């Protein structure tokens, strides 16, 4: 976010959002803008405040507020309020702890096998719940999985600004596969089909989880990190070919063998295929 916008947001700190929420400090950013730690000045409870400038040509926070309202479940932050304040769209939600990405970095890019197994089970449960609501996340990455609190080992899934319905709850009709040529997500973890610009479905969220686990097991390194091209399309094309031609047996040789089994299962899933719990 530009310094001019940041300065405008700093001015907003002296005001109250919705009459009672005040920004305390910036704690991160999402697919929409900045995330702040805030406080409800009435009950003194801390909250997370997401801020998106209204004139950016999109409204991801409105979309996210709709999804959060309809999700309501274990491991999903509570939507407290959403609306407009001055030049900004503002979403208030539960304040959570640090992301797996930040914890991983603080721990010198290392997680124990026990830790990875414990949070992987929760991550799969979270994405299964999201999928049960006919929703795909489309931006699976360590920064979008947070710990609830220091004394609570509960994993939360966040940031639904890029999410999409894959099936109509009214007609039960699945979206159709197509090559959109527009990539959505984070290329480092995105599925092979997503990186090549294909419409995403449940299988793509699962494949992205697999790349995230490979990242953790390999000390925070994946073969396509650092790929640089003048055009984004060229970069995505290069990453696509690197992922497509990855030798799992070689790259995952020091990881649990289940990683290879899992990745091969994800790669074989058909576009509309419902995920078999026994395989994950």
Each language-model region and where it sits:
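Activation segment/activation loop of eukaryotic-type protein kinase catalytic domains
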Residues: 148-184
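Conserved N-lobe ATP-binding subsite of Hanks-type protein kinase domains
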Residues: 34
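Activation segment signature within eukaryotic-like protein kinase domains
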Residues: 119-120
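ATP-binding glycine-rich loop module of kinase domains
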Residues: 40-62
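Catalytic-loop of the protein kinase fold
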Residues: 131-149
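Structural motif at the C-terminus of the N-lobe alphaC helix and the adjacent alphaC-beta4 loop
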Residues: 66-74
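Short beta-strand micro-motifs within the conserved protein kinase catalytic domain, predominantly
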Residues: 78-89
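Structural motif in protein kinase domains
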Residues: 96-105
């Amino acid at each position: 976010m530009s310094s001019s916008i940041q300065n405008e947001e700093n001015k907003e700190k002296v005001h109250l959002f919705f009459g009672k929420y005040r920004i305390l400090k910036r704690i991160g950013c999402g697919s929409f803008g900045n995330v702040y730690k805030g406080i409800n000045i009435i009950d003194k409870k801390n909250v997370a405040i997401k801020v998106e400038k209204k004139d950016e040509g999109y409204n991801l926070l409105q979309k996210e507020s709709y999804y959060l309202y309809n999700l309501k479940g274990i491991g999903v932050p509570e939507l407290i309020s959403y609306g407009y304040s001055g030049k900004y769209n503002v979403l208030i939600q539960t304040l959570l702890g640090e992301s797996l990405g930040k914890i991983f970095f603080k721990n010198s890019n290392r997680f124990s096998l026990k830790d990875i197994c414990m949070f992987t089970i929760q991550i799969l449960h979270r994405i299964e719940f999201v999928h049960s609501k006919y929703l795909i996340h489309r931006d699976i990455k360590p920064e979008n999985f947070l710990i609830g609190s220091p004394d609570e080992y509960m994993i939360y899934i966040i940031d639904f600004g890029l999410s999409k319905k894959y099936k109509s709850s009214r007609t039960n009709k699945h979206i159709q596969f197509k090559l959109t040529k527009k990539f959505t997500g984070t290329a480092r973890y995105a599925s092979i089909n997503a990186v090549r610009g294909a419409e995403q479905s449940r299988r793509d969220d699962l494949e992205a989880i697999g790349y995230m686990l490979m990242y953790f097991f390999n000390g925070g390194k994946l073969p396509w990190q650092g790929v640089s091209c003048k055009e984004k399309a060229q970069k995505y094309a290069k990453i696509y070919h690197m992922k497509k031609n990855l030798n799992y047996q070689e790259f995952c040789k020091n990881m649990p063998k289940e990683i290879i089994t899992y990745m091969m299962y994800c790669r074989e899933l058909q576009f509309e295929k419902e995920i078999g719990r026994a395989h994950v």
